[in-house]
Amino acid sequence: LAAVDCSEHPKPACTLEDRPLCGSDNKIYSNKCDFCNAVLESNGTLTLSHFGKC
């Protein structure tokens, strides 16, 4: 199972780094920061499906 450490988030601003992750909502997040912010907003219901595009 793929996992991402979101302990340093949320962050007010994310970089434009392009390292896509696919969320359990079948949405592509451009990088870990964007994904982690979304995870925290979802109260933990969003999880990582896999690294790379969906």
From Swiss-Prot:
InterPro entries with a match to the protein in the record: Bifunctional_prot_inhibitor, Kazal_dom, Kazal_dom_sf
Location of the protein in the cell: Secreted
GO cellular component, one term: extracellular space
Matching PROSITE patterns: KAZAL_1 (PS00282), KAZAL_2 (PS51465)
Cystine crosslinks: 6-36, 14-33, 22-54
Key words, A-Z: Disulfide bond, Glycoprotein, Protease inhibitor, Repeat, Secreted, Serine protease inhibitor
GO MF terms held by the record: serine-type endopeptidase inhibitor activity
UniProt-annotated site: Reactive bond 3, residues: 16-17
Glycosylation sites: 43
Main location: secreted
Domain of life: Eukaryota
Pfam family, one: Kazal_1
Domain Kazal-like: 4-54
UniProt domain comment: Avian ovomucoid consists of three homologous, tandem Kazal family inhibitory domains.
Protein name, as recorded: Ovomucoid
Organism annotation: Argusianus argus
